[in-house]
Regions:
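12-transmembrane solute porter fold
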Residues: 5-21, 26-28, 41, 47-48, ...
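Flexible interhelical linker loops that connect adjacent transmembrane helices
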Residues: 127, 173-202, 244-259, 320-321, ...
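C-terminal membrane-cytosol helix-exit motif in multi-pass small-molecule transporters
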Residues: 168-187, 202-214, 231-246, 445-455
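Intrinsic disorder in cytosolic terminal tails and internal cytosolic loops
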Residues: 1-4, 452-485
Length: 485
C-alpha cells in the first residue's frame, strides 16, 4: 500500500466514521439533552430523526453529486460542512435550534457517506480493494464500540454538547488528509443530478414523518398534522411516477423487478425498522426507567458490536458456500428470540440476567443475517447497477428505522404518563410493547427471506461486504466477484 493510498484510506475511515457514529452516539445523550433543553419524548425523537431523515432522504442525490462533480470535491464539501454544523449543534441554545442543526448535519452526512467508499474504490486497484474495504469495515466496527462508550462518558463527566464539539478536530484532520492524498478531478460530462426526484423524495418523507411524530401533540384532525401528511403522501407518489419517466432517475425503479433485489429490500425494511426502534427505545428505557447512567446504557449494547465484528465474516463465508436463504431466514428468527428476552426487564433491571443474554442471542442472529442479506441484494443487480443497488439498500435500511421510530412514538405516547419515560409501571409496559413490535418485525423479515429468496444469478462474496456499524446498516458499493448462472 502506497503512502497516498494509506492517507486516502484513513481519510475515508475518519469521514464515514464521524458521519455514521453521529447517527447513534446522540441516543445516549437524549435524556441529558431533554433535561437541559426540554422537548419531551417528541423533542428526543426529532433530535435523532432530523439527522436520519435528512441523511436517508438525500443519500441518493449525494451519490449522484459525487458521480457528476467528483467524489473528492463532494467528500471535502460534505465533511467540512459536517464540522461546521457539529459546532452549531454543540452551541445550540434551544431544542429547536439543535433539531435544525441536526437536520443540516444529516444533509452533510449524505454527501460524505456514499463518497467515502467511492474514494477508496478509486484509489485501489481491483486486486487491492478487498483488503482496503475490509480495513474500512473493521475500523468502522471499532468506532461503533468506542463511539457510544465515549459518548456516555462525555455526557456523564462533561456535557452532552461535547459529543458534537469533539467532531471538529476530527473533521479538520480528515480534510487535510483528503486534500493531500486524493488528486482533484474535474466535473464529469454527460451526467445530470436528478434534482426534481430529490426534492419530491425529501418532501414526501419529511411530510409523513413530521405528521407521525407530531400527531400526539396535535391530533390527526389538526391542519398541522393533516396537511403535511397529505402533502407528503402526494409528493412521494409523484416521486415514484417521476422516477419511472426520468431519463436519469435518482432511483432506478427497474431494479425492483429483480426478485432477490425486491425481496431482499423488503426483508431489509422489516429488519431495520425493528432494529431502529429497538436501539432508540432501549437506551431511553435503561436510563429513564431502569436508572442506568449514560455510560452504562452505552455499554449495554457493546456486546452486539463485538459479536458481529467477530462472527459476521464467518457467517458470510458460510453463506457463500451454502447459499444465503438459510441464513437470511434463521438469522432474523434467532435475533427475534433475543429481542423477546428483553421482556424480562422492569423497574429493577439486572444487566447480567435481563439485558446481556438478550443482547448476545440477538447479536448472533444479526451476525447470521447482515452480510448474506447485503450480498444477495447486490448480486441480483447488473454489474453496472451495483452502486445504485447498494445505495438503495442503504436508504431502505435508514428510512425503515426512521419510520419505525416515528410510528412507535405515536403508539408509545398513548401509554406513557406525561409524554416521557419515567420509573413507573406505565413506562415498563410501553417498553414491552416496543419489544413485541420489534420481535415481530425482525421475525417477519426472516419469514420473507425464507419464502422469497432464491439463489442469485451471480455470487457476491458476503464476507467481503461492508456491514455497517452498530446495527450493520448496509453501506454503499461492493464489488461482484464471480459469475454463476
Amino acid at each position: 500500500m502506497t503512502r497516498r493510498q494509506t492517507l486516502t484510506l484513513v481519510a475515508a475511515i475518519l469521514g464515514s466514521g464521524v458521519a455514521t457514529i453521529d447517527g447513534s452516539i446522540v441516543n445516549v445523550a437524549l435524556p441529558a439533552i431533554e433535561r437541559d433543553l426540554g422537548g419531551g419524548l417528541t423533542g428526543q425523537q426529532w433530535v435523532s430523526n432530523a439527522y436520519l431523515l435528512a441523511l436517508a432522504s438525500l443519500i441518493l442525490i449525494g451519490g449522484s453529486l459525487g458521480d457528476v462533480y467528483g467524489e473528492r470535491r463532494v467528500f471535502a464539501i460534505g465533511i467540512g460542512a459536517f464540522g461546521v454544523l457539529s459546532l452549531a449543534c454543540a452551541l445550540a441554545p434551544t431544542i429547536e435550534t439543535l433539531i435544525a442543526a441536526r437536520a443540516l448535519q444529516g444533509a452533510a452526512g449524505a454527501l460524505v457517506t456514499p463518497s467515502s467508499l467511492a474514494i477508496i474504490i478509486g484509489a485501489f486497484s481491483a486486486a487491492e480493494r478487498g483488503a482496503a474495504i475490509g480495513a474500512w469495515t473493521a475500523w468502522g466496527g471499532i468506532a461503533a464500540i468506542v463511539g457510544p462508550l465515549a459518548g456516555g462518558w462525555i455526557v456523564d463527566q462533561v456535557s452532552w454538547r461535547w459529543i458534537f464539539a469533539i467532531n471538529v478536530p476530527l473533521v479538520i484532520v480528515t480534510l487535510g488528509l483528503i486534500l493531500a492524498a486524493v488528486p482533484p478531478a474535474g466535473a464529469r460530462s454527460g451526467r445530470r443530478v436528478d434534482v426534481v426526484g430529490a426534492i419530491l423524495c425529501v418532501v414526501g418523507l419529511g411530510g409523513v414523518v413530521f405528521a407521525l411524530i407530531e400527531q400526539p401533540n396535535h391530533g390527526w384532525s389538526s391542519p398541522v398534522i393533516f396537511l403535511p401528511l397529505v402533502v407528503g403522501v402526494v409528493a412521494f407518489a409523484a416521486f415514484v411516477v417521476y422516477e419511472r419517466r426520468a431519463k436519469e432517475p435518482m432511483l432506478e425503479l427497474e431494479l425492483f423487478t429483480h426478485r432477490n433485489f425486491a425481496v431482499g429490500n423488503v426483508e431489509t425494511f422489516a429488519m431495520y425498522a425493528g432494529l431502529g426502534i429497538l436501539f432508540f427505545f432501549l437506551v431511553i428505557f435503561l436510563q429513564q426507567v431502569a436508572g442506568y447512567s449514560a455510560l452504562e446504557s452505552g455499554l449495554a449494547t457493546v456486546p452486539v458490536t463485538v459479536v458481529m465484528f467477530a462472527l459476521s465474516r464467518r457467517f458470510g463465508a458460510l453463506a457463500d458456500r451454502h447459499g444465503p436463504r438459510l441464513f437470511m431466514g434463521a438469522g432474523p428468527l434467532i435475533a427475534a428470540v433475543g429481542i423477546v428476552l428483553l421482556l424480562r426487564t422492569g423497574l429493577d433491571t439486572s444487566y447480567a440476567t435481563d439485558v446481556l443474554p438478550a443482547m448476545l442471542v440477538f447479536a448472533v442472529g444479526l451476525s447470521m443475517t447482515v452480510a448474506p442479506l447485503t450480498a444477495t441484494v447486490l448480486a441480483d443487480a447488473e454489474e453496472s447497477d451495483a452502486g445504485i443497488a447498494s445505495a438503495v439498500n442503504n436508504a431502505v435500511a435508514r428510512v425503515a428505522g426512521l419510520i419505525g421510530v416515528s410510528i412507535l412514538g405515536v403508539v408509545v405516547a398513548q401509554t406513557l404518563v406525561g409524554d416521557t419515560f419515567a420509573a413507573n409501571d406505565e413506562s415498563v409496559r410501553a417498553f414491552h410493547q416496543v419489544v413485541v413490535v420489534c420481535a415481530v418485525l425482525v421475525a417477519g423479515g426472516g419469514i420473507v427471506g425464507v419464502l422469497g429468496i432464491v439463489n442469485p444469478r451471480r455470487t457476491v462474496e458476503a464476507r467481503n461486504c461492508p456491514g455497517g456499524q452498530l446495527v450493520a446498516v448496509p453501506l454503499p458499493a461492493v464489488e461482484s466477484t464471480t459469475a454463476a448462472d
